[in-house]
Amino acid sequence: PHIAERVFVYQWKSAARFERRSGLATGANYNDYNTDYFGVDYGVGWLNNVNMAVKIGTERAANPEYPYENNLLQMSRIWRAYVISELADNFGPVPPANAFDGIVEYKSIEDIYDFIISELKDAAGKIDVNADMSAITSEKTDAFYDGDASKWIKYANSLRLRYAMRLSAVDQAKAKAAFEDAASTNNFITTQDEIAQVQEKGGWTDLDGVMSRPWNGQAMSVTFKNLVVGLGGQEF
């Protein structure tokens, strides 16, 4: 919750006028949280961890011990693509995957998105929906989908659609081709239960929601205002 809450609330939530406080909306400096987010304990640490998972999974792929190992590898690649996008969107060019050792080369955002979209397509195509995933549960391994490999494919294809749209700002032709390629699968998130999400919990853990703090004041949205104005014949 530390940086996830504060980076969101002090920066983006403030700028979007979802909360009455300073931050980006007033030019206030909360760079300490940004520094934490991009540090080895958080953003870069997350990427290092998933890179290690992909590395181990790739090494074991030639001689897997369990039927779900290939799918775990592909799920890790999909998650890594998302983590890379978060870092790149927030901080700009970052080193490519598996390059956080020694002197690294920072890639452009366009190159990063090319890698992400290609990685998502390849990983989704290698998931085996018939593999026994019964040992993979939300409590231990898969907080999103409880081991449902088919939903990871939908997640990957949906991310491809999202990232293709982001590419449109710099290369419309490439973005159009990437979007249409993902859309042609006709296999992406369409229902609420397919969304990659975790149940928010109380307390101070990694699964706590950033919008659920008792001290976190919420500004009323226009949508809610429109719903309640005139409700029951009473003016708002």
What kind of feature is each model-predicted range?
Residues 1-114, 132, 188-236:
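Short acidic-aromatic linear motifs embedded in glycine-rich loops, typified by GG[WY][YF]DAGD(H)
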Residues 165-199:
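Bacterial peptidoglycan biogenesis and beta-lactam-recognition machinery
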Residues 83, 90, 123, 163-164, ...:
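TPR/TPR-like alpha-solenoid repeats
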Residues 88-98, 125, 171-181:
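Short, well-structured active-site flanking segments
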